[in-house]
Amino acid sequence: MRKETISYIFVGLALLASLCVSCNKKRKDGRTDTYSSGVISFASDESFSPIIEEEREIFEFTYQQAKVNPIYTNESDAISMLLNGKVCLAITSRDFKENERQNLRDRRFNPRSKAIAYDALALIINNENTDSCISVKDIKEILSGKATKWGDIYPGSKRGDIIVVFDNKKSSTVHFAEDSILGGKPITSPNVVATKKTADVITYVEKTPNAIGIIGSNWLNDKRDSTNLTFNKDIRVMSVSRIDEATPANSWKPYQYYMYNGNYPLTRTIWALLNDPLRGLPWGFSNFISSPKGQMIIFNAGLLPVQGNITIRDVKVTND
């Protein structure tokens, strides 16, 4: 009987010590958030801000005691903030690299990642530019500096130098261009302009007839069009072809359907990277984005959801 009593006391003390360690960790971190309440900050590549803002607004409306504050920055800084413990959630265009994951594990963390959506990189040009089709090969030659004038791509064009416009030197769009289009090589075009944010890219292209901007497709949709078939009317969106010689017949714009069936070549995955040992609000928000409601928000915004079934219907158009 005495041994049994001592065993119960020992187990009780062990549980109490475990709880004290957990509580002390929370106090040290200064965090009081739960899965669906509290206040946290998270980092996101700025190119994803339109869709993340929609998710955030609905999440906070659904969970009235939760507040998730976005820090919109470039992808490199967002991941750095996560690795350095400044945030527990980062929204990026790539998964953890193995050395990043191992670095966190070596510090006794348990990093997690999940794909939450698919979007596309869109090429935008000035309304005065009538060159509507471009191939992946052409894009590669522009970014590598082999093609520096519009006449190099479109013989006879008088538009002069090709000015390539990105949102930020360390953004996810630049990383995609270097990793997926240039095969891991840096952009060497002599005429590259890096602005501070995506909205500035659109403004620059609107005012510059010989510019070509590279942005995330979630910035394109006209908010007045619930079908997501109308792009921003102040710029032109180019059709992109996998075939070396682009024509209207083999080139596609970043509509959902062409992203879904693989015709549009410049698609990418949006990731939620987590390093949250407390499994609090960062987990709650990222799981909301992955939920049916969160995935429907993504679908309605013109992007492709990761979860759920997508139904394709043929529509017959008649002129009455």
Features from the language model and the residues they span:
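Serine/threonine-rich low-complexity intrinsically disordered regions
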Residues: 1-7, 97, 149, 291
